Amino acid sequence: MEIQAFLNHIRSLRGYQDQIAHIEHLAPRRAVYGDLDAPLNDRLEDSLRAGGVWPLYAHQAEAINHIRAGRNVIIATSSASGKTLCYNVSVMQSLLDDPSTRALYLFPTKALAQDQLRKLHELFSPGLLPPQMMATFDGDTPRSERADVRRYGRIILTNPDMLHIGILPNYQSWAGLLRHLKSVSYTH
């Protein structure tokens, strides 16, 4: 069904009449791609190509360049513009350069963390990183698996609550993460 036909259909439904406040048609924009200051690991670039996310958009390349230069970065772009890839690429490159690297990804909800974990596995596993090295740590993580998350996890996806009640009070158990932590990402 065409978009306009779908909108007309929705408007014609009794329960939706007068509920659609605004419709705006945005003209497509031509993609603007950017270059990295330093090349990525060949396997990482191959993974990005295979995942259909190469070449990088200009804002992604700029953010990755800043992150790789050790600068703090805030990425504020529209939805579905590839913000997540900015830190995923930077973290993965760091892991390939130094396998002791750890990253902590904070999400507001368990569902979003699970969704992002699935995307990480699709793009980077098993070719670049074994699946057990990317894990969620939240209230749903079985107690029997928590030690493995601490031991093998290189990218830990969690939420602020678990950071405060599960990780920071038990900092000695999380020494490997905290000692080698090179990246913290907060998505809201």
Regions found by a protein language model. Name each.
Residues W54-Y186:
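Conserved P-loop/Walker A NTP-binding site and adjacent catalytic elements of P-loop NTPases
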